[in-house]
Amino acid sequence: MDWIEEAKKIGFSGAAVMDTSKLVFVPEYRRFCEENLCGCYHVNPACPPQSGTVEEMDRRARSYEKTLVLQTIRDGSTDPRKDKLQQNKMTEQLAEKMKAAGMGDLLIMSAGPYKHHSCMSAYCVNAQKMADAAGMICWNDDDKMRFF
């Protein structure tokens, strides 16, 4: 099945497959979790420190050869919390289709902590470099919000 096309059918604005080796992990990003702006640090098991050390999460992600990057682009006037939730629900929907097709071993990095999935901040992934490697735009001088 073409997972990029399937992702777009579900409602993602963009999707791309990239080599996981091209993901850039920045251990210093862990401080964003430690600042606890989302209120999940030391509370949600999908979040640090319960989710694992930076090194453990790096190894977990790198154990996969390929990464399916999913992007949602929204108008800047929408509620980012609702947009992240929608991104996560669509990701979950696509993951269920992938599992039904026999792809049982999936690692989901969510847009913010979601259920038992850790977010990209917890994994310390550089979203800009990931977007570049996937041929997507992360930040732009427009009124759009982009979620991965």
Residue spans for each PLM region:
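Auxiliary alpha/beta "docking" domains used to position bulky ligands
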Residues: 1-148
